[in-house]
Amino acid sequence: LVDFLQKPTPEKQLNIELVSAPKDTNENVFKASKQTIGFSDVTPVITTRETDDKITWSLTGYNTVANKEATRNAAALFSVDYKAFLNEVNNLNKRMGDLRDINGEAGAWARIMSGTGSASGGFSDNYTHVQVGVDKKHELDGLDLFTGFTVTHTDSSASADVFSGKTKSVGAGLYASAMFDSGAYIDLIGKYVHHDNEYTATFAGLGTRDYSTHSWYAGAEAGYRYHVTEDAWIEPQAELVYGSVSGKQFAWKDQGMHLSMKDKDYNPLIGRTGVDVGKSFSGKDWKVTARAGLGYQFDLLANGETVLRDASGEKRIKGEKDSRMLMSVGLNAEIRDNVRFGLEFEKSAFGKYNVDNAVNANFRYSF
């Protein structure tokens, strides 16, 4: 086998005899073809040598150039972590929004969310996200302060033209929400998530990889709920989430070529602006609040860098920024004095990656 990372030099040339034939044989009868190995297209350099009785074809070198498709495939595989980060971000502040919709009733709560997403290159993913938590209300001068604790579990899977796999994630976080008498509010949350991943790729001989990663999240949201009437409101809002996603590295061989791909820890910074509107409907012993939201979510920092290495050298692929429009509609219902149930539908559009549809159901018991 040829070590493709050991480039031939004038002092150390390859000279591997491949085949020989009678002297009068046409030189074009034996030709070498281009082959994709690793992240490169490799073309052998074949020379002929003629003696009195035969002609010999020998491998004296090779030319390597980057294969753009393999490079894109590697970058797409490593972008799965960012998409998982984004799905966690979209679920960070759900509980605090519920608190405003149920007039600030603290208690125990549970939420389940299921969704699907898609991007170019045949990429699609789906996930089921479960949250449970408990919070407490503190009545202060001019505001109500809620503090709480949450734990989460997410099962997700993703696939594209050249890879597929699944991730199991568990996380825990602390949150606080300050709701001022004026209608203004501030939400804060910090969260840690551990991910166990298993992915199989069909490019560059990568095969199946099991690996663990983790991520941190720190989010803040501020807004103002303005009551148009006693039962109807409009709520402009802005959110900023800063985080950290751990890196990973793979090393292997493809047909004798040493390969590696890695990304370092990186720090996403995601912003969102939007507006929600809502209206409550009530009867003698029931109350339902309908809500609709429209927002714009955007990356403020590029998302990491993927580094590939093979015979053609090192390739650095910088992460791209993305943005999308967010849309949601939902209902919150009072079942009994201390029991609430909510249902919400969401999707996004105009992004490189979009949530095609997501449904979120939550149950709350106040005490």
Model-derived features with residue positions:
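Solvent-exposed, glycine/polar-rich loop segments of beta-barrel outer-membrane systems
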Residues: 73-77, 161-166, 195-212, 244-267, ...
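Outer membrane beta-barrel transmembrane domains
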Residues: 228, 260-367
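Outer membrane beta-barrel translocator domains of Type V secretion systems
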Residues: 64-230, 234, 345-346, 351, ...
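Short secondary-structure subsegments characteristic of cysteine-rich extracellular domains
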Residues: 2-26, 123-138, 257-266
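Residues on the lipid-exposed face of transmembrane beta-strands in outer-membrane beta-barrel proteins
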Residues: 132-136, 172-178, 190, 220-224, ...
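Outer-membrane beta-barrel porins/channels
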Residues: 234-235, 239, 253, 273, ...
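Extracellular, surface-exposed repeat/solenoid domains
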Residues: 1-62
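Short, structured loop/turn "capping" segments at alpha-beta junctions
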Residues: 229-235, 245-249, 283-288
